[in-house]
Regions:
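Residue-level signature of mid-helix packing/kink "hotspots" within the transmembrane helices
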Residues: 26, 54-58, 62, 147, ...
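Extracytoplasmic gate region of multi-pass secondary transporters
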Residues: 28-29, 206-249
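Cytoplasmic helix-loop-helix junction between adjacent transmembrane helices
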Residues: 104-140
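Helix-breaking motifs and short loop linkers at transmembrane-helix boundaries and internal kinks
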Residues: 40, 72, 93-98, 238
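Paired small-residue
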Residues: 87, 98-106
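Conserved MFS/SLC helix-loop-helix module at the cytosolic interface between two early adjacent transmembrane helices
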Residues: 59-95
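Juxtamembrane intracellular "pre-TM" segments in multi-pass secondary transporters
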Residues: 1-5, 187-211
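Helix-loop-helix hairpin linking two adjacent transmembrane segments in secondary transporters
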Residues: 99, 137-184
Length: 279
């Protein structure tokens, strides 16, 4: 026990949240070919759908910090998981472009919040010696969440529609949310409000700006691969849709293996020394 919360339970909740982030990153790209076929979308309409995912993620990434500091981690983690699940259900049931766009913004918003929120939560409950390896282990669950969608769609799409498969995944996600609800989380760090002046002062940190610059391109490349790979395979090559999903799974598997490798490396090597080799 620690200050009224159980560290392992909180870490488990963070891992569930990271699984949801993995789902949010990969779902649209996995079902996009099926949506295009189902709704007979034009190229412009397809692009308009994909554009709304990073918009939601950017918004979520910007707002999570002040809210978590003021109201605590639980105030964001559980609602964000619900938002992602609701957006997923929107992809199943909505056939209107505006409603689909709202669903995709929701998936992105919840995912963007969960990405930062879960990392911050694990950082707060971890000691300095275990922080790097714990955050890397958390990242493995991003891979598990992201692997599940294209894998299940690729395997089961010959027997079930993508709507049925997503409904089954939604039930599992709902169980994860119900698990997180009764867990006690750490108290808010800034219960009196967010120090705006200190936050703006971070913009002067050159190392932070450099890492943000690197992450900008990395996340952009990852987003393009996640959202457009299956459509590209279907339109430009002769690769069947289910095999395109398997190809997408391979990329996510590579990310997951890298996260597992980080767990070992960060126990022996400083993260700053690993970064140049990753680039």
């Amino acid at each position: 026990m620690n200050s009224g919360y159980h560290k392992n339970l909180v870490f488990t909740a963070a891992c569930i949240g990271m699984c949801f982030f993995g789902v949010s990153m990969i779902t649209l790209g996995s079902v996009l070919p099926s949506l295009v076929t189902k709704l007979e979308l034009s190229g412009l309409q397809t692009t308009s759908l994909v554009t709304f995912l990073p918009i939601g993620m950017l918004a979520g990434s910007l707002i999570f910090g002040p809210i978590a500091d003021r109201f605590g981690h639980k105030a964001l983690l559980v609602p964000s998981c619900i938002i992602v699940l609701s957006g997923l259900e929107g992809l199943i049931f909505f056939e209107s472009i505006p409603l689909l766009q709202i669903s995709i913004v929701g998936i992105g918003l919840g995912g963007g919040i969960l990405n930062g929120e879960t990392n911050a939560l694990v950082s707060d409950i971890s000691g300095e010696s275990e922080k790097g390896s714990r955050i890397s282990f958390l990242g493995v669950f991003y891979g598990l969440g992201a692997l599940g969608i294209p894998s299940l769609l690729g395997i089961l799409s010959e027997h079930y529609s993508f709507e049925t498969i997503l409904q089954g995944i939604g039930i599992i996600m709902l169980a994860g949310i119900l698990f997180c609800i009764p867990i006690r989380f750490p108290a808010p760090k800034q219960a009196q409000g967010f120090p705006v002046k200190e936050g703006l002062g971070l913009l002067k940190e050159s190392s932070l700006l450099l890492l943000s610059f690197i992450l900008f391109f990395q996340s952009g490349i990852e987003g393009v691969c996640n959202n457009w790979s299956t459509s590209y395979f279907g339109q430009v090559t002769d690769i069947p849709a289910n095999q395109g999903l398997i190809a997408l799974t391979c990329m996510v598997a590579g990310l997951t293996v890298a996260r597992m490798l980080q767990i070992v490396l960060f126990k022996k090597i400083q993260p700053a020394k690993v970064l140049p080799y990753s680039l």
